[in-house]
């Protein structure tokens, strides 16, 4: 039975079959292992292929990469592990090659994390023998995650967080014995490199319904170990952080995917007014910020960290500690700052053009994400109450900001340059210094209000402003006025 499942899984993606055929033709002893065998037996399609090699794995990976005109990525030279990345439509495909972790394949399987990941199929056999020394098939059928050995977490504590992720991916449960082992070795997570923790945490955040996995991680004690700033299990801060992620996913999860089904809550609430931006937001959130981490996934991190005291997040200390990239740190900071700005605005009336301009001047494209994050945070804090005046104002402000970003950038966010700093120095005889930038900023704010539309109008406006500065009066900026165009 499993032979057919393996064959069907390989045939589902011709490129996968091509790689297996090439490896088999080289005459090396190689095995399909780990998640590959697990997913094949479950009938779960993925773009990954895991191969264990008796011999030089990195050299073989290089040959496959050359044959496929693909990227070759060395992962661990000390353990002889490399990845081949093929970027095609629907991809990318990841083909991982690793030298056996022990003297033979059975010992290699006993050195793995969970029994459902400790099965292998020999490519030389051809696909006739399923190697399952730890009882992975039994646990796969039962839907449980069981540690291969009692010292599995001592050997690599990150396997605890991986168990949280696999639980979310597969809908399995950890056995009571495995949960007890995990709790016993939580303290050892501090020994794991922060880069590895970050990568595993991002994979948890990438799950649909990540909040459920985060809540479980909190109950297990993992979240407090990784983010001690959130406090221990059941603390208000941790619960608020997880609720914010849950609210974000409930409100916008379908918008960030290809799923065309909206929840009843979305159809019934005033959030429906924002649905016209759904396709644009789907593209926006699919953008990769760094190392395969999409904007949507990093926004979930911002939702999680946004519950922390402001002093911890304004400088990105936590994201920096997790070894996030510079771009991700700036995004998290800006999205949280944007969310807090909207929440501080409260139930005020419509935003004027200058307020919108300054918002995006300060926050750039993360202002889009932060506006939507503010809705999730407010909804989480108000226990899903969408009838308040503040909620209606938040939706209205968010609609104005999305309209400005997606439909009126050249008018409200980045108006055309009418004068340069050189023009101010030469024509208006402004002295070099901070005043040049201040005047150009004032000019842009006048433009977004529709007060200035041509270079000649810009010169006249600045002349009046300079005279006003000299006399102690300034032209009215009309910051809350309506755009004239």
Model-identified regions with their sequence ranges:
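Catalytic cores of the polymerase beta-like nucleotidyltransferase superfamily
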Residues: 1-485
């Amino acid at each position: 039975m499993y032979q057919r499942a393996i064959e069907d899984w390989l045939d589902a993606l011709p490129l996968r079959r091509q790689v297996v055929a090439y490896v088999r033709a080289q005459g090396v002893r190689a095995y399909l292992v780990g998640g590959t065998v697990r997913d094949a037996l479950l009938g779960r399609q993925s773009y990954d292929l895991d191969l264990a090699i008796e011999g030089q794995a990195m050299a073989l990976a290089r040959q496959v990469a050359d044959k496929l005109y693909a990227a070759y990525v060395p992962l661990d030279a000390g353990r002889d592990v490399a990845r081949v990345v093929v970027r095609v439509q629907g991809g990318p495909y990841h083909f991982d090659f690793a030298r056996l972790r022990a003297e033979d394949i059975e010992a290699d399987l006993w050195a793995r994390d969970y029994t459902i990941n400790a099965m292998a199929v020999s490519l030389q056999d051809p696909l006739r023998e399923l190697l399952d020394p730890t009882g992975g098939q039994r646990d796969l059928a039962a839907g449980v995650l069981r540690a291969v050995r009692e010292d599995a977490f001592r050997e690599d504590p990150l396997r605890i967080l991986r168990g949280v992720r696999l639980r979310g991916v597969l809908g399995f449960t950890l056995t009571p014995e495995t949960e007890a082992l995990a709790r016993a070795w939580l303290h050892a997570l501090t020994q794991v490199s922060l880069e590895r923790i970050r990568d595993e945490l991002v994979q948890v955040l990438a799950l649909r319904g990540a909040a459920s996995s985060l809540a479980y991680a909190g109950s297990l004690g993992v979240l407090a170990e990784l983010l001690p700033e959130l406090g221990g299990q059941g603390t208000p801060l941790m619960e608020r952080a997880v609720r914010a992620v849950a609210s974000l996913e409930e409100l916008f999860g379908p918008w960030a995917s290809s799923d065309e089904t909206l929840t009843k809550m979305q159809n019934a609430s005033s959030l429906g007014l924002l649905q016209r931006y759904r396709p644009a937001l789907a593209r926006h959130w699919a953008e990769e910020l760094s190392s395969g981490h999409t904007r949507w996934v990093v926004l979930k991190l911002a939702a999680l960290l946004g519950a922390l005291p402001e002093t911890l997040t304004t400088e990105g200390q936590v994201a920096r500690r997790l070894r996030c990239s510079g771009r991700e740190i700036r995004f998290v900071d800006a999205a949280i700052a944007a969310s807090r700005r909207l929440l501080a605005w409260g139930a005020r009336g419509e935003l004027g053009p200058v307020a919108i301009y300054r918002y995006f001047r300060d926050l750039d494209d993360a202002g889009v994400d932060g506006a939507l994050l503010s809705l999730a945070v407010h909804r989480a804090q108000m226990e899903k109450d969408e009838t308040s005046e503040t909620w209606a104002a938040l939706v209205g402000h968010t609609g104005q900001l999305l309209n400005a970003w997606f439909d009126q950038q050249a008018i409200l966010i980045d108006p055309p340059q009418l004068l340069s700093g050189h023009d101010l120095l030469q024509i208006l005889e402004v002295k070099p210094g901070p005043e040049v930038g201040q005047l150009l900023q004032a000019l842009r704010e006048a433009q977004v209000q529709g007060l200035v539309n041509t270079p000649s109008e810009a010169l006249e406006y600045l002349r009046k402003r300079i005279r006003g500065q000299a006399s102690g009066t300034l032209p009215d900026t009309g910051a809350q006025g309506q755009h004239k165009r």
